[in-house]
Amino acid sequence: MKFLTTGLLATAALAAAQEQHVLQAEDGHGQAPQRDASIFDETLQKFQSSLEDGISHFWSEMKTNFKDYLPLISLPKKHTRRPDSEWDHVVRGADIESVWVQGADGEKRREIDGKLHNYDLRVKAVDPSKLGVDPGVKQYSGYLDDNDADKHLFYWFFESRNDPKNDPVVLWLNGGPGCSSLTGLFLELGPATIDKNLKVVSNPYSWNSNASVIFLDQPVNVGFSYSGSSVSDTVAAGKDVYALLTLFFKQFPEYASQDFHISGESYAGHYIPVFAAEILSHKNTNINLKSALIGNGLTDPLTQYPQYRPMACGEGGYPAVLDQGTCRSMDNSLERCLSLIETCYSSESAWVCVPAAMYCNSAILAPYQQTGMNPYDVRTKCEDMASLCYPQLNAITKWLNQESVMQALGVEVQSYESCNSGINRDFLFHGDWMKPYHRLVPSVLEKIPVLIYAGDADFICNWLGNLAWTDALEWPGHKKFAEAKLEDLKIVNNKDKGKKIGQVKSSGNFTFMRIFGAGHMVPLNQPEASLEFFNRWLGGEWH
């Protein structure tokens, strides 16, 4: 997860005032028009009188302090779209939407629900021998195109190493918002990593050991994805993900009949409740969703933010990072932070959710970040802030930017970056950061099991906060889950049988896991443990 500096305040007014409209340049590349500062003035005057004093003051300060930054210009990624003839398959959403069938009641209905006519899916069969990533394993890459909105989402699919005809299919999503899921592929749970010499190294603990995995770069303008428009909230991104899965399973019906699971980490704590709810809202679908998994997620800020001070001040199982004075200062700031989040929860408006995010992140998160310690692992210093404290990302980025790699994958943008700070900014300043997406989890639990797991050395989405929000969640099984005790989680499937890897509690469709000795990215720090609980979860244990 990537947090913002105050230098990005300048864009708050722009994002809250008006969605970006896109003009088409003569070369076919989308270019955003210049935004007029008067839009900010007019919109501010319209809403300011209705805001609480503290929030109104925040926006007045924005206008005064950052006027010189207005207006701004936002440009899309440079890209060259490949003709359809260069792809092995092109699936038209309009064709799927046009199919009608007769139901058991004799009434005609569409075979598959959802707005799909504006979407296409382009598919390329990847030759593993050209890249050296999981040789012998069937792979596909390509783009989901929203032709109406000029959005193009990149994906890379790996078939299971074990039994692809029967093993489940899993979607993996990294967070940010704005970070590529290829980070998860090459740094965490995918079939290979890239060493400092840009050599491909196989990962024996890959999650495709017993499952087929789709890595998706979303929202648009993340990783190899691109667009002439933008997505700046989680709900809009959910429509794209539903379309991708629908068209993918239509092209590959051999996977559609198998169990499907949606998984991710960090800001995926926002994404997954929305995406799962979107899929489950459709009665007639070819997506066989069976469960959801969220690792070290941000899901319920109101319940999670009070746990930052304990985690940073020695109450999360690791030595304190902050001194007592700073810890007291965080305590003193918490009441106002929570008041702002509560107001955001009540209105879900950017005009109140943005101040909540800016104040809380400054008062509650910034003290830790100023120490130079890794916000994703309280045990280590941040080696390289530009690479999110993980220098390994530099090699991954260099490898993915090789022309031979991009050609083999059918990539249409000119370059790859692991995280797009512009996407992070847009989500934050549209108020998405603090919104109460946890409220969707009870309806999801009515239909499928949900696993919340957390590496216990992470600060930024720490295990204390994830335990707190799962215990506090109001759903029919709330009391039994909250009363359930954490029990030892042990390895059962290999030579290390009996080794403690964490703690687990479960009741009904809800499960929480604390994974020992892991930071924000559990599969990176504890690859054996992550594959252990992942395989057991897919196998139906705990639900």
Swiss-Prot record:
Transmembrane segments: none annotated. It is found in: Vacuole. It is an enzyme of class 3 (hydrolase). It catalyses: Release of a C-terminal amino acid with broad specificity. The active site is at residues 266, 458, 520. Its EC number is 3.4.16.5. GO terms for molecular function: serine-type carboxypeptidase activity. Keywords: Carboxypeptidase, Disulfide bond, Glycoprotein, Hydrolase, Protease, Signal, Vacuole, Zymogen. Pfam families: Peptidase_S10 (PF00450). SUPFAM superfamilies: alpha/beta-Hydrolases (SSF53474). One of its GO terms (cellular component) is fungal-type vacuole. One of its GO terms (biological process) is proteolysis. Disulfide bonds join 179-419, 313-327, 337-360, 344-353, 382-389. Glycans are attached at residues 210, 509. Belongs to the peptidase S10 family. This is Carboxypeptidase Y homolog A. It comes from Trichophyton verrucosum (strain HKI 0517). The lineage of its organism: Eukaryota, Fungi, Dikarya, Ascomycota, Pezizomycotina.
